[in-house]
């Protein structure tokens, strides 16, 4: 950066891969655009399509006879979701109990819930703590508990949607194909660029790479069958191109994350950024927020000193392209840069008082990034290259037209 941030390009200068929506104009024109909470109505699908959604639900929730299922919930979760998990557990000869917290925003598990979790073999959770609390990680690692995070399954009617009905095996093959885009071994630099001037770099060691590749999510295991697993339902949010815990980093460990992210949008804002906003990292922390508009002021107010919690990459071709609420986009090649700040944002507390994420968090979003891992391209102008993998295309043939399944994004 040489002490100065790169100058962002204007919207008119953005480069777009023909036929794929990734520009600000595309976001603004989209009927599915959502950056703030609002109730969605999901039209009923036909019975054949609905059964595909039900089948995926039952397979991801891989409850075994004799399991003890604990569900961590919140007051805003559709009660039918709880009933669905309970019914599946009872139908498979498992026991079930649920615990309702005040919200989803716990970053650590409260003591009264720890006693319930200690007995569990299978956990379904809406809580943010599920992924970051060392207590939860230890339960998976030491007791082999299987966890399902349901950030994106808060309404039972989602079973009627194309994203819920997308073949879970095909999704796993897409993830494995993305995993094959990483180098096989050795240290490398993961680099993110885009037409606005983003130049963001994450150094990877071979140890980090091998740890990431062993994770069940990067092996395309999106059903909660393996002891110690952690999966998302609806599958899949991510998996993350970078996540400190997933690559074996210890808290406060620094690896030299540097550079500038000129995001197009962020969770908590109704529309994409009206003027350029750049978040600059130096030595693994947010050093500055560049820009003159309202959005830049909001981010500058609380992100300075924050750290990178994740870089998530969407993998679900039938996820609504421009729905980024509550935790970033799930559409292929769309990225969210998750940053945890040192203090909560008053702005986010005002506009999203019941947000599913803690108010210290921020997901910056890009749809047109180019990502390289060493000298290997992974994403080009927002297009996830694993969608063209021969194994992915061959598997897609089993389920229908590969072009429709893999590249007809709902916008």
Model-predicted regions and their roles:
Residues 324, 331-401:
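Internal helix-turn-beta structural module
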Residues 275-279, 285-288:
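Conserved active-site beta-strand-loop modules that form the wall/rim of enzyme catalytic pockets
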Residues 1-16:
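Short, Lys/Arg-enriched N-terminal segments with co-localized hydrophobic residues
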Residues 272, 288-351, 401-409:
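Dual-mode signal for accessory low-complexity, basic/Gly-rich regions
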Residues 13-260, 265-270, 274, 282, ...:
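Active-site bordering "gate/hinge" segments
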Residues 274-276, 366-367:
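Short loop/turn microsegments at loop-to-beta-strand junctions
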Residues 183, 195, 254-256, 304-306, ...:
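A generic structural signal for short, non-catalytic loop/turn and secondary-structure boundary residues
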């Amino acid at each position: 950066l040489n002490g100065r941030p790169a100058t962002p390009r204007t919207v008119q200068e953005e480069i777009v891969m023909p036929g794929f929506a990734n520009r600000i104009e595309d976001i603004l024109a989209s009927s599915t655009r959502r950056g703030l909470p609002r109730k969605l109505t999901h039209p009923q699908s036909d019975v054949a399509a609905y059964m595909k959604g039900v089948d995926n639900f039952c397979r991801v929730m891989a409850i075994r006879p004799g399991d003890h299922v604990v569900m961590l919930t919140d007051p805003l979760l559709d009660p039918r979701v709880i009933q669905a998990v309970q019914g599946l557990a009872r139908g498979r000869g498992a026991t079930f109990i649920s615990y309702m917290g005040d919200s989803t925003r716990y970053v650590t598990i409260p003591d009264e819930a720890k006693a319930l979790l200690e007995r569990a073999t299978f956990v379904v959770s809406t809580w943010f703590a599920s992924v970051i609390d060392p207590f939860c990680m230890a339960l998976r690692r030491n007791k082999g508990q299987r966890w399902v995070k349901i950030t994106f399954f808060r309404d039972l009617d989602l079973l009627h949607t194309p994203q819920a009905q997308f073949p879970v095996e095909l999704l796993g093959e897409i993830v494995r194909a993305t995993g094959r885009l990483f180098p096989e071994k050795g240290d490398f630099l993961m680099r993110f660029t885009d037409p606005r001037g983003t130049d963001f770099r994450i150094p990877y060691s071979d140890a980090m790479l091998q740890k990431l590749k062993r994770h069940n999510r990067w092996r395309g295991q999106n059903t909660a069958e393996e002891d110690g697993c952690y999966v998302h339902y609806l599958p899949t949010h991510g998996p993350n191109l970078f996540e400190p815990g997933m690559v074996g980093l210890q808290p406060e460990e620094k690896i030299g994350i540097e550079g500038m992210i000129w995001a197009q949008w962020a969770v908590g804002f109704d529309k994409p950024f009206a003027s350029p906003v750049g978040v600059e990292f130096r030595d693994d922390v947010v050093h500055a927020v560049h820009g003159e508009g309202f959005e830049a002021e909001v981010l500058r107010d609380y992100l300075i000193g924050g750290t990178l919690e994740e870089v998530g990459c969407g993998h679900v071709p039938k996820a609504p392209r421009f729905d980024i609420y509550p935790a970033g986009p799930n559409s292929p090649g769309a990225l969210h840069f998750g940053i945890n700040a040192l203090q909560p944002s008053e702005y986010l507390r005002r506009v999203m008082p019941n947000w599913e994420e803690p108010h210290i968090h921020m997901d910056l979003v890009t749809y047109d990034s180019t990502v390289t891992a060493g000298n290997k391209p992974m994403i080009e102008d927002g297009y996830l290259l694993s969608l063209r993998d021969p194994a992915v295309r061959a598997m897609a043939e089993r389920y229908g037209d590969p072009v429709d399944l893999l590249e007809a994004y709902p916008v």
